[in-house]
Structure formats: C-alpha cells, structure tokens
Amino acid sequence: MIIHKEQVDCILPDGTPGKKLIVSYVDKEGNVKFLQYPIPKEQMFEWKYATKATADPPFQEYDFENNCFKIDENGNPIIRQWKSYDNKYIKRKEVNKLPELRLNELLNSFGKAVDPIFEMNIPNTWWCDIETDVTDEGFPDPEEASTPINTISLTKFPKTIIFSRKDLSKEDQQWVQTQIDNYSKDNNGTDITKGYEFEFKYFTTEKEMLEAFIDFIVPITAIAGWNFLGFDWLYIYNRCKMHGIDINRLSPTRNMTTFKITPRAGGNTINVKIPYHKIIYDYLLVYKTWDMTIKVKENNTLDFVASKALNIKKVNHVWGFKEFYEEHFKEYVFYNCIDTILLEHIDRVLRTAEIWFMLASVLRQELNTAFSTIAPTHIVMCNFMYPQYKVIVDNHKIGEDADYEGAFVWPTRPGIYKYIGGLDFALTYGAYAA
C-alpha cells in the first residue's frame, strides 16, 4: 500500500544530475519501507499526441522474464507501438519531472517485482488529540494557533501517553491510571479501557513539549485523530513554526506535501502540510467518506460516534475548558486520554480505515489519492491499458482551443437554444462558476 511517491534530485549512475523516484509503502508488519529508483534519462518524458510521421516508432515486444524478444506461433516478431487510449499516434516529450500518470506507467513497467508495494497492510497507528489554551473569546483558530497547546495525548495499546506543559503529582497520575482502568466498566460494563498503561511526560515550556513530541513520532508509521487534519495537526504544525521547531525532520526527505480540505457546505479550502512518507490522517474524514456501519448519523462528533460504536461516551464534565485546565487538571488529563482510547476502539469496531487502505491497495494508488474522485479513475484506466501498450495523454488546451469539458461537464455545442437549464449538485468548480 503506497503512502507517497516523490521525485528528488540525485546523481545518476553515469555521474550526471537526474531524478530519483522514492516510493514509501506499508509492509506486512505495518512499518514504512521504501523503493528507490534512479530514473534513467530516456524515461524522463511525457506523452503527447502526434502525427503518424512524428509518432513513437513501432518496436518488437520483449519478454523480460525470459530475456528474449517475443515471436508469434509462425516465428514472426511481435511488433507493438505505443498509442493513446483513443488509439491515436503519440510521441515522447522530454520533461524535468514526470507527471503522475507517467510515474504510474513506470511502476507498471516493473511487473511483479513491485507487487509488495501494493499489498493491503494495516499501518501501525498512534491516536492523537490535543487540548489548547482557551481564552474568554473561545477556542482558537488552528490556522492562527494563537494560544499554546496544553496537553497532547498519544495512544496505542497498551500505552496512553500525555505530553504536558503543566506538572501532575505522582498521586494524581495514579488517580488518572485508576480512572482509565475503570472508565468503561463503570459506564457500560466492558473492559475496553482496561489494560492501558498511563505515562505522563512533563515539560517546562511548550517548545520543549513539542520538540519531544516531534522526536517521538519521527519513527511512527501513522498518526491519526478525530478532526485531526483541520484542527490538531494544523495547530501543532503552526505552533512548531512559531517556535522555530524543525518539523520537516518528520520526513526522511525533509519535504512536505499539501493535503487540501474543502468544506462541503462551503467555506475556504484549508491547505494542510503533511510530511512525505508518513501517514497523517483524519479519522473523521475517513468515517464521513466511507462508513456504512452507523446507519443514522445524527452528527459526526466523537461523542456520538463512540456512543453508537462502543455504547460509551466521552468523559462528561461541567466546567468550561479554561476552568477545567486551571482548577481540575487531573480530570483534564483523564479527559484527554479517554478521547484517544475511544478513537482506537472505534477503529477496531468500525474498521472504516480498512476500506480506505483496501481502495488504495486494489487501485494501486497513493493513500490520499483515494479521497479524490477523478484521479483514481485515471489511474485505474492507466493500469488496465498499459499492458495493451495504450496510455493516457495530456491533451491540455489553452487559449482559443480550450473547452469546458471536464469530469462532470458535457462538451460545449455552439448554437441557439430556446431553453437552457443547469443542475448544481455540490458544485466542484465553484470558483470558476462565480
């Protein structure tokens, strides 16, 4: 199961500068592994439509398994020619960076040798939740991240860990441990919260706490939470930037990619930076996209979903979050721990993330591409047609040749019409419609 594909600068075996393809994937043990391939210069191209005279020339098909050219039953060479999916002539155009579909063709060309990168394996995941300082104006905007992070909860059975910039006595730490052990038994008679070992990590400053948190998650395969990308991770990222913390070290290539969150009900798109080759995801987004277990979704809060999936709710409290933190800190820490413990068990019961992992594996695409609507279709088409020596060609038009045809748009037909109608089902291209 592919996490990310990335092209980085390198020195090729012949001593010249070029590109190297790095593919991160999840192995059978749930850990991150890498495929690295210096891309030969003759492979640095994209396909363009051509005439018969300028087209890529025919060639004799080669059998890589047996290291010989292929012939038919009559002993004649089997001749092939690369063409577009619509059976038109094409040619190669040199590029400095391969487009996504060319990367997919490259992986297809490796045959069964790369089958392990497409296996459906479950990543080792830590569940995360943060609590921030709250002012009289309410909760801070994660894009501004104007107040410090108070605590960070990380859970993966049998550990539940709190990173905190406020200390907690040993006696109160033991109280939290006891409350965790008994929480599910007291609320629904189960043992789902029993067996977790509570660990408390105190730091004198928020910067020290965030540095330790980043150090802790560097070797982790996956980290997830509820509404995690749009709040928790975005908040952590922005607070790290404010403190000058090197968050890029989360990626082995020290590079970041962007995950875009667009609210379905409108609003501005949020661009969230995610390190290459690490799985950082939002279980709320996964749940809203693929869950079919909870039939009636009154709302998408963690409290509601936990009550339906586990028959247990979040820790109830009567205080405002400012008072909660300042005057009832041990309960505050306990509250933070239970959120991540419940989320871990929601995943075990609903198994919604496995649908996401399965789609990425079966469709042979990156994990986050599975959230898209168009890209997966292109990749599936590419995978299907490549063995037939057919490819998808970039036919982008500009200027007067441009058309409006797209994913859900019919070709424009110039003419005079008496009646014109338009149907907008959560318009994908709202910015253009304006």
Where do the protein language model's features map onto the residues?
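Conserved RNase H-like, two-metal-ion catalytic cores of nucleic-acid enzymes
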Residues: 3-61, 68, 102-222, 409-413
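Extended, Lys/Arg-enriched charged tracts that mediate electrostatic binding to polyanionic substrates
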Residues: 106-137, 247, 251-273, 382-399
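Short, well-ordered loop/turn elements at secondary-structure boundaries
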Residues: 120-122, 147-148, 217-222, 230, ...
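Residues immediately flanking
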Residues: 128-132, 228, 283, 423-425, ...
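Short helix/loop capping segments that flank catalytic or ligand/cofactor-binding pockets
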Residues: 135-138, 162-164, 233-234, 289-291, ...
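Conserved DEDDh/DEDDy metal-dependent 3′-5′ exonuclease domain
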Residues: 153, 163-297
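Hydrophobic, small-residue-rich alpha-helical packing segments that form membrane-like cores
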Residues: 238-352, 359-364
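Common nucleic-acid-contacting/processivity interface regions adjacent to the catalytic cores
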Residues: 320-434
